[in-house]
Amino acid sequence: MKKQLIFAALALLLATGCNQQKIEQTNMNKESNELTAFDVQEAFEKNGFTWFTENLILCSGDTTRNNAMTIGWGGIGNYLGHNRPAVTVYVAPGRYTWEFMEKYPRFTIMQFDDPSIWQYMGKYSGRDGDKAAALGLHVAYTEHGTPYYEEAKIVIECETMTAWHQTEQDFRNDTPKQWYDGFEPGIHTIYIGEIIGAWKRQ
């Protein structure tokens, strides 16, 4: 059951918002008239869980430097308690964003209506240039200084609780061994972050 909760996915949750606020978070209406806080736990109770069905953008850093990438693996559920909503994301050590995830305590995941955003973010590396600027995205920050993009449809802010640096010894069958065979970016690190803020565009 714990595994099911942790790796349950994001689609229905992200599609639904609630008016009441039960977890401490910034009111992004101070920064944008179109992003409104919603209650993640209440959305859990109304919708249950489903698998990831679309790509999302992961961003980490602070007000001086940050980077974002496309993610297709992950989930949302409860971790270390029934009332502690959490997000699970996977970042390979060869990715530029991995350096930010290792250094900074918080990150955001975002949903966009325009698929060209996650297509570009997944194709190019931040080592070679400012991807947000190339896409015309505007960086903003939560009250904790966590970066996100003003144009996002959904923004979820997380504080990392657990980072699991997988090795081949962690694999229990041949599926991950076969998948990672020849994968140059390396075996993904699994990050589990407590959700400390969630906003959606009205």
Each language-model region and where it sits:
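Positively charged n-region of N-terminal signal peptides that target proteins for export
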Residues: 1-4
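C-terminal motif of bacterial Sec signal peptides marking the signal peptidase cleavage site
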Residues: 14-17
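Heptad-repeat coiled-coil amphipathic alpha-helices that mediate oligomerization/assembly
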Residues: 19-21
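Sec-dependent N-terminal signal peptides
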Residues: 6-11, 125
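Active-site-proximal mixed secondary-structure blocks
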Residues: 23-202
